[in-house]
Amino acid sequence: MTTAIRRAAGSSYFRNPWPALWAMMVGFFMIMLDSTVVAIANPTIMAQLRIGYATVVWVTSAYLLAYAVPMLVAGRLGDRFGPKNLYLIGLGVFTVASLGCGLSSGAGMLIAARVVQGVGAGLLTPQTLSTITRIFPAHRRGVALGAWGTVASVASLVGPLAGGALVDSMGWEWIFFVNVPVGVIGLILAAYLIPALPHHPHRFDWFGVGLSGAGMFLIVFGLQQGQSANWQPWIWAVIVGGIGFMSLFVYWQARNAREPLIPLEVFNDRNFSLSNLRIAIIAFAGTGMMLPVTFYAQAVCGLSPTHTAVLFAPTAIVGGVLAPFVGMIIDRSHPLCVLGFGFSVLAIAMTWLLCEMAPGTPIWRLVLPFIALGVAGAFVWSPLTVTATRNLRPHLAGASSGVFNAVRQLGAVLGSASMAAFMTSRIAAEMPGGVDALTGPAGQDATVLQLPEFVREPFAAAMSQSMLLPAFVALFGIVAALFLVDFTGAAVAKEPLPESDGDADDDDYVEYILRREPEEDCDTQPLRASRPAAAAASRSGAGGPLAVSWSTSAQGMPPGPPGRRAWQADTESTAPSAL
């Protein structure tokens, strides 16, 4: 016999977790804002600091690489010391590093400060998903993650617009200075509104962190510098060395029986595994496309940073409007068909855009594929996050969110590095003078990368051809979605749980809360009804893991893995014997 337990009044954040969510979104918003702002400012930074294309790309890649590496351990650090504490540390580091970026007088100092920024962002981001997973029940998590996606979309809109206006009026340094007051406000809100969740003891696999960091750095460095080094043998040796480090990292995680950096059990969930593949694909495509489109808009079309930002605005507006509705849809239905639709629109929109990237294309024709990209983003980001986290056990929340975000950042940094190599090769093939023509004018008054008239057409062709890479990669997202869609409908539970399901709602999430967060003055009432056979069968795995996942979430219950342990209690007891 089990008990139905009412939480005490002190646990208000489980009943109303929204203030904590909005407090966390301030820091998340600032990180997303920073990414889009720098993309718009890259041509101006390149012109004013008198640096070449290969160097300015490191302003983005260094940040993304430093962002990705600590996220693997940041989830565990959040579990050990509390996600609130790690969030505050990450936001503080990011804010101070933003000040350093704005004070930079050269490319070296700017890139170094961007690395510190990335570390702060890497510590902060996993705490948002981990906290959402722990304070929102499964049946409300889709709406919460829809709001999370809306914040990202709004940042994608505000970031380029604000960044373009700041670059045009005050200089590129102010795209970093603006983070300082926002960061201070975010720290104050987080300190008061984010709950202090229970800590879990963890060991930290620092050897694994070193292996993964070395592997990712070598791969990214080889890809990004390969074209400029004419793909000499030492470049290939660097890339192979990076792959070797990553292979050793995977082997070490499999052998580490104490507590691996990545608990491989999270990949037993097919949804989580394929969601990681697809988040890497969308991050690769999204980050990769920003580089050629931004350079095309400013160097070929002659748009200012502000006008370039306006060109991206339809994507953010459409994505922000649709994201909450998509969140409600996936709370009530299987998200896998939604993902297939989203990735299809993404591939079509990118192909459409590359066909329009010519010197004489009217601006209104460029806006149309950007609208389609907004539709694609709304139908990809939130469904991916919900699919990845819906079945995860609470004690894996920190590690799994760290893995998910690290894979996303790894996809982004690989997209940036691969695009750097691909763009450089296309520029060398299409333009007289090759990459040297991209150094642009020097001087503090240069805000737009200016090209001679006779090279604008070949440069536009090079940028258009560069868009083939993210468009091609987006196709793999469609393939990944098809692997999960069961056209016979067997993947979705056909019979819901009975209305009177006894103690079928006492899943691992409830047990976790009762064990980790005991409350005083809780009223307990014994439930006399026995577990229905249908509910017990679904909990034991009948119908497959997807059937368990979507049938429980449809009933508004936090999902638990199949095969939960049976409580052994006397029929006259008022509490489970395990408690």
Curated annotation (Swiss-Prot):
GO terms for cellular component: membrane; plasma membrane. The keyword DNA-binding does not apply. Signal peptide: none annotated. Its main location: membrane. It is a multi-pass membrane protein. It is found in: Cell membrane. Residues 526-540 have a biased composition (Low complexity). It comes from the Bacteria. Residues 516-579 are annotated as: Disordered. CDD domains: MFS_MMR_MDR_like. GO terms for molecular function: transmembrane transporter activity. The keyword Transcription regulation does not apply. Pfam families: MFS_1. Keywords: Cell membrane, Membrane, Transmembrane, Transmembrane helix, Transport. The chain crosses the membrane at residues 20-40, 54-74, 86-106, 142-162, 174-194, 204-224, 234-254, 279-299, 310-330, 335-355, 366-386, 467-487. Residues 570-579 have a biased composition (Polar residues). Belongs to the major facilitator superfamily. EmrB family. This is Uncharacterized MFS-type transporter Rv1250. It comes from Mycobacterium tuberculosis (strain ATCC 25618 / H37Rv).
